């Protein structure tokens, strides 16, 4: 699919018809979830955050709203929606959940489930200063271009680990966020 013609309807039909394949068995047991907020527009957007610089883990990194499942969450989807409300003030009832992607292991020991949801374009996003330093929207067509992701093999605790890297404007997108976006691009089948 040509990215210049990526409408929300095209994205939805391809997302629903082309189900993701499990690429590997996850090893981590602690559960977390992130929301992949697709902004409902004729040319859809993707809402991303930049984590606050003072955080202990992943400080300053571009990320999806999300976090660990807690005892009040009825499901992984509920956890993603709760975290999105806490981090960027997206009301759970404003999200039209369209599905989930296969879980991904994080280097911090979590099994992270990406939840894909459609959000209205007129939401007054507000970053929680405790967790988020910036909220920005990237065109979905750009996020789903496979050619924008570049591999880097790193070694951590004696093991080789492939990390994906990309840029959008002045934001450096890498690690789990870039990996999730790349997997979504592979599923949707968008060509540069």
UniProtKB/Swiss-Prot annotation:
Annotated positions binding Mg(2+): 83, 87
Q: Which Pfam families match?
A: NUDIX
Cofactors required: Mn(2+); Mg(2+)
Organism superkingdom: Bacteria
User: Does the record bear Oxidoreductase in its keywords?
Assistant: no
- List the GO molecular function terms: coenzyme A diphosphatase activity; magnesium ion binding; manganese ion binding
According to the record, the signal peptide region is none
Keyword vocabulary terms for this entry: Hydrolase, Magnesium, Manganese, Metal-binding
User: Could you mention a single GO BP entry for this protein?
Assistant: nucleoside diphosphate metabolic process
InterPro entries documented for this protein: CoAse (IPR045121), NUDIX_hydrolase-like_dom_sf (IPR015797), NUDIX_hydrolase_dom (IPR000086), NUDIX_hydrolase_NudL_CS (IPR000059), Nudix_NudL (IPR023735)
Q: Where is this motif: Nudix box?
A: 67-89
Q: What is its EC number?
A: 3.6.1.-
Segments forming domain Nudix hydrolase: 29-160
Name the family the entry cites. Belongs to the Nudix hydrolase family. PCD1 subfamily.
Q: What does this protein do?
A: Probably mediates the hydrolysis of some nucleoside diphosphate derivatives.
Which NCBIfam families would you find in this protein's record?
PRK10707.1
**Stored PANTHER family:** MITOCHONDRIAL COENZYME A DIPHOSPHATASE NUDT8 (PTHR12992:SF11), NUDIX HYDROLASE (PTHR12992)
Specify the protein name: Uncharacterized Nudix hydrolase NudL
* Lineage, top ranks: Bacteria, Pseudomonadati, Pseudomonadota, Gammaproteobacteria, Enterobacterales
């Amino acid at each position: 699919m040509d990215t210049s013609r990526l409408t929300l309807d095209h994205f939805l039909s391809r997302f629903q018809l082309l189900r993701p394949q499990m690429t590997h068995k996850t090893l981590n047991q602690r559960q977390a979830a992130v929301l992949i907020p697709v902004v409902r527009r004729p040319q859809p957007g993707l809402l991303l955050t930049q984590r606050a610089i003072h955080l202990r883990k992943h400080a300053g990194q571009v990320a999806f709203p999300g976090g660990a499942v807690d005892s009040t969450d009825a499901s992984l989807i509920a956890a993603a929606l709760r975290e999105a409300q806490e981090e960027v003030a997206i009301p759970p009832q404003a999200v039209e959940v369209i599905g989930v992607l296969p879980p991904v292991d994080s280097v911090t020991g979590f099994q992270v489930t990406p939840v894909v949801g459609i959000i209205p374009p007129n939401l007054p996003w507000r970053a929680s200063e405790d967790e988020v330093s910036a909220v920005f929207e990237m065109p979905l067509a750009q996020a789903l271009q496979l050619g924008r992701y570049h591999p880097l093999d790193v070694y951590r605790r004696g093991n080789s680990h492939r990390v994906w890297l990309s840029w959008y404007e002045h934001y450096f997108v890498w690690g789990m966020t870039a990996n999730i976006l790349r997997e979504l691009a592979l599923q949707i089948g968008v060509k540069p």
